[in-house]
A protein has these predicted regions:
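Conserved alpha/beta enzyme-core scaffold
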Residues: 1-205
Length: 205
């Protein structure tokens, strides 16, 4: 953002950014930067409403493939957990797509955040220091939780209609909002067993 007037036709892709995104805020005419997102945070939805963010619809499971097959990435920057003793950085909560983006990038920049959790699985959840061009380090504030949405009477009614359709051994995904929170509480008291959880996101539900 500080170099705005030196730069032109810079396209930036983000994903669930809490904001503010300085390159957007400093260039409301979009003469220098164009900002795109795959999944909108509340902040990015407000940017879309103002015409300052372009939403690209995408099924999450296809996103890594889409990067690997179709997109050019000049510079990629990702937040990571601190490097382990073997020289690997863990991609933490964005393991589903980060490795594909970093593999496509001409330049890889990592920002180390000491508060990010380490997630396990396969090998796409890490990147080795030898594959990194630059590392940014600094102090970070601890993460804060999103405030819970209070449930309405309608949320409670819908949750009560859904509960009888969930059986032992079912896999559920409970998103963000009043109704998923109510349904989660009903499930906890229901006596159902062996429930699985689809963990695209985890909420208090």
């Amino acid at each position: 953002a500080a170099r705005r007037d030196e730069l032109h036709d810079v396209k930036v892709r983000g994903n669930l950014c809490a904001g503010p995104v300085q390159i957007v805020e400093c260039d409301p005419e979009q003469a220098h930067f164009l900002y795109h997102t795959w999944h909108c945070s509340a902040y990015e939805r407000r940017l879309c409403d103002r015409g300052l963010c372009y939403f690209t619809p995408m099924i999450f499971r296809n996103l890594a493939w889409y990067y690997r097959e179709f997109l050019t990435v000049n510079v990629a920057m990702a937040s990571v957990a601190p490097m382990d003793r073997h020289g690997y950085f863990n991609l933490s909560a964005v393991t589903g797509v980060s490795r594909a983006i970093l593999d496509r990038a001409d330049i890889v920049i990592l920002e180390v955040n000491e508060h990010l959790p380490r997630l396990r699985g396969g090998f796409d959840e890490v990147i080795h220091i030898s594959d990194v061009d630059m590392v940014v380090e600094g102090a970070h504030a601890p993460f804060t939780d999103l405030p819970a949405h209070p449930a309405t009477a309608e949320d409670t009614a819908i949750a009560n209609l859904l509960l009888p359709h969930i059986c032992d051994g079912a896999t559920v995904q409970l998103g963000i909002g009043g109704m998923p929170t109510v349904l989660g509480k009903l499930l906890a008291r229901s006596g159902l067993h062996d429930l699985g959880m689809h963990t695209e996101l985890c909420s208090d539900a």
